[in-house]
Amino acid sequence: VLTEESAEVLRTTVGMVSGHADAITAAFYRRLLAAHPPLRQVFNQGSQATGEQARALAAAVVGFAGHLLRTPGPAQPGQPGQAFNGVLRRIAHRHASLGVRPDQYPVVGQHLLAAIGEVLGEAVTPRVHRAWDEMFWLFATALIAEEARIYQRGGSNPANPWRSWRVTARTVTTPEVLSLDLVPAGIDPLPDYLPGQYVSVAVDLPDVGRQARQYSLSRAPGAGSLRITVRRVPATGDAPAGAVSSHLHNRVAVGDLLDLSAPTGHVTLAPGADPLVLISAGIGTAPMIAMLGHTARLRPGRTVVVAHADRSPAHHPLRTEMLDLAALLRDVRLHTWYEADTPPAKGAPADDPGPGAGATRAAGPAAASGSGSDRPAPGRAVACEIRHRGRIDVDALPLPDGARVYLCGPPPFMRDVRAGLLRRGVPEARIRYEVFGSDPWAGAPT
């Protein structure tokens, strides 16, 4: 329980810690990784290079401290309160996908408190140190409890979270996006998972060592295999190219083995008959395809709105599969936004890249892998697609009453869309989102 004395200290020092958060987290990672080099395998070295991981840690720690100060009554370990639950669950699921263990938390706490002392100097009195140590252990205890539940549900062992999987198919869906189908390499059964969940994929890289990244499962359960859909992350001004995504694109072939975690992730398709609104951008379409496929198979009468934004139809991953699955639904509205789009000619199929404008028609029924031509085969069912030019416009989206909304895409995209949804009156509790990589949006509710 956070004591009254510690709450008072946190109140007077949280602004100071927040103001020096970048320096504190940089010192933390420097200290931690120098003392425990094997932990480099747990952390995304690309995000380390850009500082994104440090910013995410700072947002989570300061966000939890702020949450404790806003929560009335005593804070109970393992019961962080509704406002922070989504953030905590997201972090715990990410940790579970990497095999984070309870015995690693004391090391983290030691170096985090040492980093606070290094940066803030004499301002960190014994009283201040005790308060932040207390806050850290409330956070750690809540994470450990949630991670234990995840390991138990998934039947996984944090001491050995990886299982070997064999690549059975490799499909290039756009010039930058690759889908890999996988089956267990040994006698392990195919794990159960929920639409919207992801796996960590671990690979051994020259000069870097073992690195893991998270990839959504992009096919609904029940297919007899898992599928991940991977965007090749290009180098930018301040960030190197994605090491793991480049390895998967350049080096992995059918028949190769990959190490995968058990499926995790808390942003999953809600059961029931409430209308669904699935909004994505870029590779964020991957979990939406799993949700769409699951709904088409089990609840084809459910009201569904699908909205996707991309650079162009040619850059839209799994576009054909999205169109095919939408055609299996009886009450679906499908909107796409393309920044560089030449809509189809009048009377042409939706995936025809020729000139034209307006509402268009899309193909179905569902393609199993999203491979093949984007033109519909003769005689297949069609679903109406409304295609727009430019960036997504939340005001143009149909929003059924009582809908559950799911977002996945770059954090700036989701921040803007979420703000637009709130402005239109969608309750915050009905908006869920997934972020991959180090999460710079860690302090926002889900």
Positions of the model-derived regions?
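Structural motif
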Residues: 275-277, 305, 404
